[in-house]
UniProtKB/Swiss-Prot annotation:
Alphabetized UniProt keyword annotations: Ribonucleoprotein, Ribosomal protein, RNA-binding, rRNA-binding
Gene for this chain: rplX
UniProt family annotation: Belongs to the universal ribosomal protein uL24 family.
UniProt xrefs under InterPro entries: KOW, Rib_uL2_dom2, Ribosomal_uL24, Ribosomal_uL24_CS, Ribosomal_uL24_KOW, Translation_prot_SH3-like_sf
Alphabetical GO biological process terms: translation
One GO term describing the cellular component: ribonucleoprotein complex
GO molecular function annotations of the record: rRNA binding; structural constituent of ribosome
Organism from which the protein derives: Streptococcus pneumoniae (strain Hungary19A-6)
Assembly and binders: Part of the 50S ribosomal subunit.
Name under which the protein is recorded: Large ribosomal subunit protein uL24
Length: 111
């Protein structure tokens, strides 16, 4: 049993993007992307999808115990916000010979 291969899509969300969660238990939450995982089309968003992990004692955490941390959510469950706070889908276009991301709803360039 290996890892299922998923067709890799262009990076819609990048580290540092402000996003709004549009599905799941944290629907409506606006937060910052901590990590983008393009190979599995997921992102880790600050304060969203908190899970409890049973941590074995280590040098950093000598007592071990139950630790709460953010888990990855699928990139289709978030929308990127532009500078005005408008959530929309992300598209790509060329500006001055450079490929940039833009918000399809507002037309504002994200990069």
């Amino acid at each position: 049993m290996g890892v299922r291969k998923i067709k890799e899509k262009p990076n819609v969300c990048k580290k540092g993007d402000k996003v709004r969660v549009i599905a799941g238990k944290d629907k409506g939450t606006e937060a910052v992307v901590l990590t983008a995982l393009p190979k599995v089309n997921k992102v880790i968003v600050e304060g969203v999808n908190i899970v409890k992990k049973h941590q074995r004692p280590t040098n950093e955490l000598p007592q071990g115990g139950i630790v709460e941390k953010e888990a990855a959510i699928h990139v289709s469950n978030v929308q990127v916000l532009d500078k005005n706070g408008v959530a929309g889908r992300v598209g790509y276009k060329f500006v001055d010979g450079k490929k940039v991301r833009y918000n399809k709803k507002s037309g504002e360039v994200l990069d």
